[in-house]
Amino acid sequence: MDTPINVFSEWAQNGKDEGMEKHHRDSVMNMLDFACNGLSEYSLIDAGCGNGWVIRHTSNDNRCSRAIGIDGSSNMITKAKRLDNKNQYYCEDLLNWIPSKKVDIVHSMEVFYYFEDPALLINHITKNWIKKEGRLIMGIDFYYENKASHSWPQECCITIMKLHSEKEWKVFFEKAGLKDVKSWRNGQDKDWGGTLIVTGTN
């Protein structure tokens, strides 16, 4: 068993990170379409950006004024910077980092359950990263209702993976002070619950 950061650092070295883009693209596009709908301009942080593929995609949107990626893995950030010298990337602990300017959208895919206390992270992001009326939107595949994901901690040999229900995730958002909290699932199949998407505004 190993920490999430060490596991994903290894993925950055062996190229496994590239599969994350392929597997998560549809759900990420669903989230970005929802979050950016109706906006004439926006700034965005990708929390747990990995190799930066979401930032590279978002920065090609003419409406995007600023795109920032943050990740705890130095290998991932090194790779992101190598692939993209246009945008900003930071290797920092998400629980401690504060951006110089707040943003309109904070997006995160498959990250929050790797924290011992996800509610603490959501509180920190809501308070310190998001503008008034800004949005937090999160996607995860590891959650209680998605039974196919329950074996992942053992299969991936990762020490911290917090299993919560859809209702519990929504409560985390609400207790952080986020309003109009919504959730839905993208990509459901017969034995697959799909990506749980949760969002709310500041």
Residue ranges of predicted features:
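Conserved beta-strand signature within the Rossmann-like core of class I S-adenosyl-L-methionine
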Residues: E133-D141
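Conserved S-adenosyl-L-methionine
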Residues: L178-D189
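Class I SAM-dependent methyltransferase SAM/SAH-binding core
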Residues: I45-A47, N51-N96
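A short glycine-rich, Lys/Arg-flanked "PGG" loop and its adjoining helix->strand segment in the class I
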Residues: A119-E133
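Short, glycine-/aromatic-enriched active-site segment of Class I SAM-dependent methyltransferases
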Residues: D141-I160
